[in-house]
Amino acid sequence: TPIKSSAASDVYKRQDKNFLVIDGYYDNLGLFVIQSIVETVARYAKSKGFIPVINLKMGGTSFYQNNSDDDIWDKFYEQPEGYTLDEVYKSKNVYFVTPFYNGSVQSTLMERMAGDTQLSWVNGVYNTRVKQYIQERLEKYLSAPSKTLGVLARGTDYINTHLHKHPIHASKEMLCEKIDEMLNNDKTLEYIYIATEDAGYCEYFKGIYKDKVSFTDQERFQTKENELLADYHRNEKIKRDGFFLGAEYIASIYLLAHCKSLLASGGCGGLDETRKENGGKYKDVYVFNLGVNE
């Protein structure tokens, strides 16, 4: 007698599908860089006839993890094709990628081979918990987006370390001069929203712009000379919940993407994500281009 349970029926529906479970080693990379290169692998897999499913444990090396078995993809994101890991593990044809690192060369090749293949994101990119976190901060810290200049001000290790081939970022003083210029050129800009992880930057800009400037309530930091922010988090005596480390970053960039115009201290994963989310709707954009560290 055939099995007529709903579970058996679901497995039957998936028996002709080939799932590829993706993991990788991305150690010190920020969340948006991780997201971008994992999406590249997923698009490549989809272009080859697989349904990509992401289970990102990274060998327990990420500061977004609460423990070595923590899946940081599930912590923040939905699955790109809508299938949950639980559904996939009950399916017939499941393949696993040995965790690896796809650097710039591999990612470029995968991008080319993926061509026009796009991920579906049937449930959106962020999971329900992250969406709620974003909405709460959007309502509280960006009340007049059409009158706000968004500023991406990377401090901490972007200023205190000089990593080879990484973009050089503008100082807070240089940003201040450019803020004044952009406010003067567009009189409809009445407010400034600043996305920064540097506690010293908040004090500096608040001292100058007073009630004109806003920041989210994320925890901020100050690193020492040549100290990476990733190492700072790993060495904290009281380790923070990895969800909040990531959600704070996601929310700060989401708000930035909804401002009228954009000023950025230099290139980074956060800038790429901001422009992607904004979709070309900024009135004005200025990004400091000061070269790269030798």
Descriptions of predicted regions:
Residues 23-25, 34, 54-57, 152-153, ...:
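Short His-Asn-centered micro-motif
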Residues 13-19, 61-189:
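Secretory-pathway luminal glycosyltransferase catalytic domains
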Residues 1-8, 12:
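Single conserved hydrophobic/aromatic residue that forms the stacking wall/gate
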Residues 153-158, 183-240:
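Catalytic donor nucleotide-activated moiety binding site of glycosyltransferases and closely related
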